[in-house]
Amino acid sequence: MRPNEEQLEAWKAQYGDVYELTGETEDGSQTYYFIFRKPGRAALSRFAKQVMSDALKAMHNLVFDCLLFPDQDEVRKLFEEKPGMAISVGSELQKIVGTNQDFFVKRL
């Protein structure tokens, strides 16, 4: 069951920007649906400190720092079945705040 519009509006009022992430299994048999708040400075700082020593743990913590829906127990079970999903979801959260932004350098 997905959150209703009232719950989404409450999260927006509390956290500001709220994002929906969806994905499907390769065969299309299952759809994954998440709601996240935008990662803040504290979550990014924690991520930056952890990523050099344990990238998977850093991604995992970034996801759980920002997760609004579904509940954490459900996502933990999912990540136990598919541990790499924490990296995929965490990468999407990084895009939201610009840590994966591509820049081009040109000598002048």
Where on the chain are the PLM-derived regions?
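Low-complexity intrinsically disordered segments
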Residues: 2-12
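Short acidic-hydrophobic surface loop/beta-edge motif
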Residues: 16-29
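Short, surface-exposed, charged amphipathic helix/loop patches that serve as local interaction elements
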Residues: 27-108
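Intrinsic disorder/low-complexity signal
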Residues: 5, 16-19, 64, 101
